[in-house]
């Protein structure tokens, strides 16, 4: 089974990702293949450069070919992207100040990125 995660609820990255999902991925015991992870709202803060969670996740994502994407509008609002609100959803916003491998985008970019690695289910946390 192949799944992407959408981290949309309060503290999803600081609790569910960092204490459950990430350790399981690091140990190779998580189960399904992870196609990607999409981060919304304050959940993107876990991906800031030098954040321990983000740095660990960046390493795992590179090893396991996991897409890491932040909501472009969420990143612009938090000064973690280069671009304007008018560019959101177009693919023109670039992630900035985040760990290696993170891209910024909206649903069109997410769908395009996952098209070559189509998931079976989507899990929103």
Please give the residue ranges for each predicted region:
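A generic structural motif
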Residues: 30-35, 66
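A short beta-strand-loop structural module common to alpha/beta enzyme folds
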Residues: 33-44
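Internal active-site segments that recognize and position negatively charged phosphoryl groups
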Residues: 121-125
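Mid-chain, well-packed structural core segment of small domains
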Residues: 56-108
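C-terminal binding/interaction regions
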Residues: 117
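Charged helix-capping and loop-helix junction motifs
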Residues: 20-22, 51-56
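Short, glycine-rich nucleotide/cofactor-binding loops
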Residues: 3-19, 43-50
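Histidine-anchored nucleotide/phosphate-binding helix
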Residues: 14-32
């Amino acid at each position: 089974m192949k799944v992407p995660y959408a981290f949309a609820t309060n503290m999803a990255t600081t609790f569910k990702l960092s204490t459950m999902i990430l350790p399981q991925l690091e140990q190779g015991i998580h189960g399904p293949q992870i196609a990607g992870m999409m981060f919304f709202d304050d959940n993107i803060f876990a991906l800031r450069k030098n954040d321990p969670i983000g740095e660990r996740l960046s390493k795992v994502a590179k090893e396991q070919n996991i897409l890491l994407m932040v909501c472009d509008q969420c990143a612009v609002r938090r000064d973690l992207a280069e671009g304007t609100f008018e560019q959101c959803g177009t693919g023109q916003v670039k992630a900035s100040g985040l760990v290696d491998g993170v891209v910024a985008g909206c649903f069109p970019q997410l769908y395009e990125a996952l098209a070559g690695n189509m998931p079976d289910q989507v899990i929103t946390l």
